[in-house]
Amino acid sequence: MSAKIIDGKTIAQQVRNEVAAVVQQRLAAGKRAPGLAVVLVGENPASQIYVASKRKACEEVGFVSRSYDLPMATSEAELLALIDSLNEDTEIDGILIQLPLPNGIDNVKVLERIHPDKDVDGFHPYNVGRLCQRAPKLRACTPRGIMTLLERYDIPTYGLNAVVVGASNIVGRPMSLELLLAGCTTTVTHRFTKNLRHHIENADLLVVAVGKPGFIPGEWIKPGAIVIDVGINRLESGKVVGDVAFDVAAERAGWITPVPGGVGPMTVATLIQNTLQACEEYHDISQN
């Protein structure tokens, strides 16, 4: 295996330790701990696992963690009313609504109801627009986490041909904006892209987020490329794999993220970072 491993687990722990140290400094200075409200509607098992990891991370760094586990029958109006009250709550710096929401609740309306300065997921049109305008505030967690990995490993991005596979609002689209901001020539591919292989073979930096195990054959990877695999797919055997065929890709790439232990841990660590940022940049002024 020639590729160097980008260890997201280690970097995520570094980020958490840094945030925990700032929380301790805040408390020593007589300031309050940052607060995160996590809202889960219904009982989706995958969502319950994600929510538990976010709450645990909050407690580890010394945040105030508030949990709102709402029944599946919760109406859109009830959820919007909860968001309104959390927007006004001076102990809460971040509001996280775990997606997907049940049928009958409008995702867009719900995410837009969160005040932009408490939008620690970075999904609000205001925050996406700030990134578009090259003046980011709160940034989407997974793309920001990927940029943190590249920075911590001193991997330069200026002038690289970057290819993003997948154009979701959560990863692909904000990722393309992050890469533009980082000086890359950026291509976004999606289900209508013709000759996907051609784009990937020319990618100096490849970010794949489609949710299909082994979707990108290792043979397509450009020798020496940086491969960021966002996919987390559980096979019937129980094994967790990414969207890139890892073994062959790792023989060709210069750098690669493993699955698990690559991008995944960074998403939660960045949520924690964003919550601290929201507290210090937006809410300290009015609080202290």
UniProtKB/Swiss-Prot annotation:
Signal peptide stretch = none
Highest taxon of the lineage: Bacteria
EC number(s) from the headed UniProt entry: 1.5.1.5, 3.5.4.9
Residues engaged in binding NADP(+): G166, A167, S168, I232
The keyword Cell membrane belongs to this UniProt entry's keyword annotation: no
Alphabetical list of InterPro entries matching this protein: Aminoacid_DH-like_N_sf, NAD(P)-bd_dom_sf, THF_DH/CycHdrlase, THF_DH/CycHdrlase_cat_dom, THF_DH/CycHdrlase_CS, THF_DH/CycHdrlase_NAD-bd_dom
Keyword set for this entry?
Answer: Amino-acid biosynthesis, Histidine biosynthesis, Hydrolase, Methionine biosynthesis, Multifunctional enzyme, NADP, One-carbon metabolism, Oxidoreductase, Purine biosynthesis
GO MF annotation list: methenyltetrahydrofolate cyclohydrolase activity; methylenetetrahydrofolate dehydrogenase (NADP+) activity
Q: In which pathway does it act?
A: One-carbon metabolism; tetrahydrofolate interconversion
SUPFAM superfamilies linked: Aminoacid dehydrogenase-like, N-terminal domain, NAD(P)-binding Rossmann-fold domains
A GO BP entry: methionine biosynthetic process
Q: What does the record give as the reaction this protein catalyses?
A: (6R)-5,10-methylene-5,6,7,8-tetrahydrofolate + NADP(+) = (6R)-5,10-methenyltetrahydrofolate + NADPH; (6R)-5,10-methenyltetrahydrofolate + H2O = (6R)-10-formyltetrahydrofolate + H(+)
According to the UniProt record, one GO cellular component term is: cytosol
The record's function comment reads: Catalyzes the oxidation of 5,10-methylenetetrahydrofolate to 5,10-methenyltetrahydrofolate and then the hydrolysis of 5,10-methenyltetrahydrofolate to 10-formyltetrahydrofolate.
NCBIfam families listed in its UniProt record: PRK10792.1, PRK14186.1
Can you tell me which family this protein belongs to? Belongs to the tetrahydrofolate dehydrogenase/cyclohydrolase family.
Could you give the subunit structure recorded for this chain?
Homodimer.
Protein name, UniProt field: Bifunctional protein FolD
Organism of derivation: Yersinia pestis
